[in-house]
Design a protein with these regions (language model features):
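Short acidic-hydrophobic, aromatic-tinged amphipathic segments that line or gate anion-handling sites
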Residues: 114-121
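Terminal low-complexity, poorly structured segments
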Residues: 7-10, 71, 102, 122
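STAS-typified acidic loop motif
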Residues: 6-50
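Short, low-complexity N-terminal regulatory "tails/caps" that precede and couple sensory modules
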Residues: 1-5
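N-terminal hydrophobic or amphipathic segments with adjacent small-residue motifs
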Residues: 21, 29, 68-70, 116
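A short, charged, amphipathic alpha-helix used as a generic interaction element across diverse proteins
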Residues: 122, 126-128
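Amphipathic alpha-helical interaction surfaces in cytosolic regulatory modules
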Residues: 36-113
Length: 128
């Protein structure tokens, strides 16, 4: 089991507007977030994800399918996490709902962030 923050069955409150947690599934870290990924929450989002990533070497899946809103600060945090994964030679995938995917595609980051449509597809890609 990964060290660092404990995996939890319920999402913990990272800020007033963002909850997050992770689980280990199919030899991958699966992060789940709900709420808003914006200027107010990006610092806590980044710190939480970075702490978990630094504690182990498993591939990472960021499930943002329940995120209501992403602004430029949130996109910046996602880019930094993607760079952290790339620098560590860690495979990663990102899943988003229509709103999140549209925002990512608007700034042409879908390939850089390894955006896919759903969690099963992401897990398949990471285990290949």
């Amino acid at each position: 089991m990964p060290e660092g923050p404990e995996p939890i069955s319920e999402l913990q409150r990272l800020t007033v507007s963002l909850r997050g947690g992770f689980e280990q599934k199919d030899r991958c870290l699966v992060f789940h977030f709900t709420g808003q990924l914006d200027a107010y929450s990006e610092k806590q989002f980044s710190e939480y994800a970075s702490d978990v990533l630094k504690a182990n070497k498993l591939p990472a899946l960021f499930d943002l399918s329940k995120i209501d809103f992403v602004d430029s600060s949130g996109l910046g945090a996602l880019v930094q996490l993607a760079k952290q994964c790339t620098d560590a030679k860690r495979a990663f995938q990102l899943v988003g709902n229509t709103r999140v995917a549209q925002t990512i595609k608007l700034v042409r980051l879908e390939e850089f962030l390894h955006l896919v449509n759903d969690v099963p597809t992401a897990l398949r890609n990471l285990s290949a």
